[in-house]
Amino acid sequence: MAAPAEAEVAAAPGLTEAAEAAELTRALSRLLPGLETESKLGRRRALEALEQVLEEAVRPGADSAAFQGPWARLLLPRLLRLLSDPAEGCRALAAHLLDLGLRRAARPRDALPRLLPALSARLARPELARPPPEPCEELRLALVQLLHLAVDLGGAALAPHLDDAVRALRAALLDPFAAVRREGCECAAALARATPEHFHMQSESLIGPLMQTISHQHWKVRVAVIEATGTVIQFGSGNSVDDVLSHFAQRLFDDVPQVRQAVTSVVGGWLLNLRDRYSFLHKLTPLLLSSFSDEMPEIRQTATSLWEKVGLQWQQENEADLKDKLDFASPPPPNYPEHESRPGLGCRELVFRNLSKVLPAICHDITDWVVGTRVKAAQLLPVLLLHAEDHITQHLEIVLRTLHQACTDEEKAVVGSCIRAAELIGTFVSPEVFLKLILAMLKKAPSASGLLILASVIRGCPRNALQPHVTVIATELAQEHICQGSENNLYLEHLLLCVQALLSVCQEDCRAASLQFLEVLVTIMAVSDAVGLEKKAQKTMDTLAEVEDIPSSQDLYRKHVGALLERLTASHGEWAVHSVQLLKFTVLLTQAGPAVGEALQHVIPTLRACLQPSTDPHMRLKLFSILSMMLLRPKDTVDSQGQFRGYLDMVINDILAPNLQWHAGRTAAAIRTAAISCLWALISSDILSAKQVQEAQETLMPQVLATLEDDSQTTRLMSCRIINMFLKNSGDTMEPEKFLKVYPELLKRLDDVSNDVRMAAASALLTWLKCIESLDGKSAYQSSVQFLYRELLVHLDDPESAIQDTVLEVLKEGSVLFPDVLVRETEAVVHKHRSATYCEQLLQHMQTMAAAR
């Protein structure tokens, strides 16, 4: 009896399953005819009734095996037909019921042969130009979600149906509705994971639609496309990597960080897991390393972490080849950047072994017409150099050529990255190598970018390696074709950077090249028209003085001014106003201070040669201006050593005298003004003895008297003052004939248009009168003095009270010579004056003086 009982119990589940299936079949059979009715409302009500039945069937605890038969036999074919129903509501309910049925069915994969063609038919467009068969966006989304569900439930069973699935996905990936595209991306990735052994046969057909969608306006769609592409290629054909690289590279410029993060993660995943990844190392590595320079710390951290894993994995896979390098690890190069951590051996080897393939593309992109491309390529270059280290030597020529071009970029970010790259070259490459190339480049065509590269490599170079080359570099920089290669401020600024870099790196080692450095700095100060640059050059000169261990830049000039002037003045015969040599000469004269007095043997002969009437007038004006400034401070300039008197004859006879001669023209007048100003500065200083002033007067008095008629007010004023000075120092020793020629010329200046000139002339006339007072035979001058009295009395009635006051003082002082004569002359004209006040004051003064006598 026991055996039949056990059989009955075992059969019970089967009976229950059959009973449930039969009951479900009966329930469905009552509703199915409603699906065939022509009434849209009738079909909808039938579908709604079916929905209630199915929701009851899929309740927890329901038997999926009992559901499988009625579902596959009765419902599935009818629901699939209803996906094409004219009524949108019926199609939506049909899709929903299919979703419920797939989730409940015991063997959902059995539905795939009928489901996938139906989905493909509703999603795939027969032609790209035509709209999809399913016009409703929400329904298309539901159909793609249904396809995704089928992929998740069907797994490897989808392999025979890949064509239909891929056809539907291609349409979904290009759907106008963004949500459909995102769902399509997720479904494509799921399909790749579900059919790893067969997916490669269809994967390439998805790449085209994915790449068409990768620039979609919604960033979430772009992220989904990138992630889906990563999975599709991972499980599909590696040949598609070439098709997506340019699109991925473009996404690294995306404004949305999540998109760049997705590219970084996918590329890193490929480098770790792609089956034939070794074939694409040189293509994928630049993409991952580009994220090292991303503005977002999270992306940089992701890229760094992935790259470390890639390098470590490659190192482990190639351990046999790297055995020696692993056993005898090389230390970091000297002067290794402090803020950089050295990449692992695997990472360094990966870059080094692929550098020849990567560099040409980087060097091409760094000069691209698109700004973003140039910036990215420039940022990548220092990252590569940091990995390649001294292996960059074999590629140095192409890198330097690229940097030379890129450093002219208007984008500061590009130039900044190039500077960083050049500094790394200085760190990793021997100076013998990079100097040979860079100096040859500068010798061939000096440029601002070439100098910037040189300054940068010097900054990155270790001091002990650079020390033997300091003099060579400084000498090359001091060559005319480089230090005088351009007057452009940017060029000069980069030239200054070279000097600053050498002083900063080599410090005391620069003493041997101090003269060359000074010459370069003087050139920069001479040629530059930017005040800021001149200040920087002066500050650098102070640094050079510190390196030389001397107190100041003035002492630096004192040490080298002789050699500088000797080299510089050798070509003075070829100078013009804009000659660099002349500009340098003027800088030395104005900046060297007391050192000028130690090099008069070069300064004065050069001035004599350049200040001849036959030379460039504008150059003469410039030099006279500088000479005048020096003569105003002789103890701090030309006479600092008390040697200027030895060159006085040359200054007076060969420089001043020729330039005081009258010549027609405004320029000639300006030169006379400059020359007379120099003469005034000379004789008003304390460096000349009375005898030397007398000698100057004997030589120059005729020319100075002639300049009293000059058109320039300044010239006339200076001439009056000079004559006054000559008379004070040597008037009583002049020959009578020459002495008498002075006062008529001064009298004419009392009618000058300038009151300053008139007053200076009056002062000189007073000095002339005092000179007669000191002479023994003053009676011989009575007629001349009487004439002078008469003329001065005319100006005593001048409209200008200041002139009247000045003339009155002259007459009072001069009355001591011949007071009776002056009284007669005054009384003769007093009634002619508009006001007798000044004449009465003069007469009163003479009466007082007579009483005192």
Swiss-Prot record:
Q: Does the keyword Chloroplast apply?
A: no
The UniProt entry annotates HEAT repeats at 69-107, 200-238, 240-276, 278-316, 374-412, 597-636, 694-732, 736-774, 782-820
Q: Where in the cell is it found?
A: Cytoplasm; Cytoplasmic granule
Give GO terms for biological process.
cilium movement; inner dynein arm assembly; outer dynein arm assembly
Family of this protein = Belongs to the DNAAF5 family.
This protein's assembly is summarised as: Interacts with DNAI2; probably involved in outer arm dynein assembly.
Matching entries from PANTHER family are given as: DYNEIN ASSEMBLY FACTOR 5, AXONEMAL, DYNEIN AXONEMAL ASSEMBLY FACTOR 5
- The protein here is known as Dynein axonemal assembly factor 5
Which gene carries the instructions for this protein? Answer: Dnaaf5
